[in-house]
Design a protein with these regions (language model features):
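Charged helix-capping and loop-helix junction motifs
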Residues: 151-159
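Short acidic, glycine/proline-enriched helix-loop-strand junctions
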Residues: 113-114, 165-169
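A short, charged/proline- and glycine-enriched loop
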Residues: 25-29
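Catalytic beta/alpha-barrel core
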Residues: 12-13, 31-41, 45-128, 138-140
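Glycine-rich phosphate-binding active-site loops on the catalytic face of alpha/beta enzymes
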Residues: 95-105, 136-150, 175-198
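NUDIX/MutT-family hydrolases
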Residues: 1-24
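Structural motif
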Residues: 44-46, 90, 132, 165, ...
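Nucleic acid-binding interface residues in structured DNA/RNA-binding domains
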Residues: 155, 174-175
């Protein structure tokens, strides 16, 4: 017997049937959300960056200047990803879906070989994300946030009830700090995501 780190698991030769479980274990536990692409070079080993920006030619040029070796820790929305060149698309393996984008998709629509992270705000979206093959979901808002003060928070009890009904990793998003990770995991979160303090 020997214990392996999550990073080492990807280098081992597992049967094909085990690949889904291995992929689930390779998600980081913290997702930073920002418009600042420079954060990418300062991420912790157990962190990814969701670059939440609108699709513009300037953003595509900015991404083209980013070192290719850093792109594997980057998450971009499906709309932006579809406008990238082939090398960028092959390197950025995690694609974000807004809930509106998610609900327009059906089983078989997702590109194979990529990880999809779905933004969900209710149970029906969460279940749909799992059914069409998304590998993880952001469920929000867990707590009240400064960025969306008028959006009612789910609260931890409702978050847990929803997260328990799917088998994909669910990240808690909304009003959280890095120190909330351990509590979030006790509430059936795989990890946490956030703009300011994650």
């Amino acid at each position: 017997w020997r214990w392996y780190s999550r990073e080492e698991l990807g280098q081992l030769n597992f049967p094909k049937a085990n690949q889904f479980m291995i992929q689930k274990l390779q998600w980081p536990q913290r997702i930073k959300i920002s418009e600042d692409l420079n954060i990418l070079s300062n991420l912790d080993t157990d962190q990814m960056l969701y670059w939440r920006v609108d699709l513009t030619s300037e953003r595509i040029m900015q991404l083209a200047q980013c070192p290719v070796d850093q792109l594997s820790k980057l998450i971009v929305n499906q709309q932006l990803w579809s406008h990238l060149n082939e090398l960028q698309q092959q390197t950025i393996r995690t694609i974000h879906l807004k809930q509106t984008q998610l609900m327009e998709l059906k089983q078989g629509d997702l590109k194979s070989g990529y990880r999809y992270l779905a933004a969900c705000h209710d149970l029906s979206a969460l279940i749909h994300a799992e059914q069409i093959g998304c590998e993880a979901a952001l469920l929000s808002p867990v707590l009240a946030t400064e960025t969306h003060p008028d959006t009612p928070a789910l609260g931890w009890e409702r978050f847990k009830q929803m997260a328990e009904q799917v088998q994909i990793p669910v990240f808690a998003l909304g009003g959280l700090r890095a120190e909330d990770l351990h509590y979030a995991k006790r509430q059936h979160a795989y990890g946490i995501a956030g703009i300011r303090y994650v």
